[in-house]
Protein backbone atom coordinates (compact mmCIF):
# COMPACT_ATOMS: atom_id res chain seq x y z
CA UNK A 1 0.00 0.00 0.00
CA UNK A 2 2.91 2.35 0.64
CA UNK A 3 3.95 1.94 -2.98
CA UNK A 4 0.51 3.13 -4.08
CA UNK A 5 0.80 6.27 -1.95
CA UNK A 6 4.32 6.85 -3.28
CA UNK A 7 3.07 6.54 -6.86
CA UNK A 8 0.30 9.04 -6.12
CA UNK A 9 2.79 11.48 -4.56
CA UNK A 10 5.19 11.06 -7.47
CA UNK A 11 2.34 11.75 -9.86
CA UNK A 12 1.33 14.83 -7.92
CA UNK A 13 4.88 16.19 -8.11
CA UNK A 14 5.12 15.48 -11.85
CA UNK A 15 1.77 17.10 -12.47
CA UNK A 16 2.68 20.19 -10.43
CA UNK A 17 6.08 20.61 -12.09
CA UNK A 18 4.56 20.01 -15.51
CA UNK A 19 1.90 22.61 -14.83
CA UNK A 20 4.44 25.14 -13.48
CA UNK A 21 6.77 24.68 -16.46
CA UNK A 22 4.00 24.38 -19.03
CA UNK A 23 5.23 20.87 -19.85
CA UNK A 24 2.00 19.15 -20.88
CA UNK A 25 3.66 15.74 -21.31
CA UNK A 26 5.03 15.76 -17.75
CA UNK A 27 1.68 16.99 -16.45
CA UNK A 28 -0.10 14.17 -18.30
CA UNK A 29 2.36 11.58 -16.95
CA UNK A 30 1.75 12.88 -13.44
CA UNK A 31 -2.00 12.57 -13.80
CA UNK A 32 -1.52 9.02 -15.06
CA UNK A 33 0.71 8.09 -12.13
CA UNK A 34 -1.80 9.53 -9.66
CA UNK A 35 -4.68 7.65 -11.27
CA UNK A 36 -2.69 4.42 -11.35
CA UNK A 37 -1.75 4.75 -7.69
CA UNK A 38 -5.35 5.43 -6.69
CA UNK A 39 -6.60 2.46 -8.72
CA UNK A 40 -4.04 0.13 -7.15
CA UNK A 41 -4.97 1.41 -3.71
CA UNK A 42 -8.66 0.78 -4.42
CA UNK A 43 -7.92 -2.78 -5.55
CA UNK A 44 -5.93 -3.41 -2.37
CA UNK A 45 -8.80 -2.07 -0.26
CA UNK A 46 -11.26 -4.39 -2.00
CA UNK A 47 -8.93 -7.34 -1.46
CA UNK A 48 -8.65 -6.51 2.24
CA UNK A 49 -12.44 -6.22 2.61
CA UNK A 50 -12.96 -9.51 0.76
CA UNK A 51 -10.43 -11.25 2.99
CA UNK A 52 -12.16 -9.83 6.08
CA UNK A 53 -15.48 -11.25 4.89
CA UNK A 54 -13.89 -14.62 4.13
CA UNK A 55 -12.24 -14.70 7.55
CA UNK A 56 -15.54 -13.88 9.27
CA UNK A 57 -17.31 -16.57 7.26
CA UNK A 58 -14.69 -19.15 8.17
CA UNK A 59 -14.82 -18.12 11.82
CA UNK A 60 -18.62 -18.43 11.97
CA UNK A 61 -18.81 -21.56 9.84
CA UNK A 62 -18.78 -23.98 12.78
CA UNK A 63 -21.42 -22.10 14.81
From Swiss-Prot:
Skewed-composition ranges (Basic and acidic residues): 22-46
Pfam families for this protein: CsbD
UniProt superkingdom: Bacteria
Region (Disordered): 1-46
Similarity field: Belongs to the UPF0337 (CsbD) family.
Protein name according to UniProt: UPF0337 protein SERP0494
Source organism: Staphylococcus epidermidis (strain ATCC 35984 / DSM 28319 / BCRC 17069 / CCUG 31568 / BM 3577 / RP62A)
Amino acid sequence: MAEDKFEQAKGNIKETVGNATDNKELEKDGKGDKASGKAKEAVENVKEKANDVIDKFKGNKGD
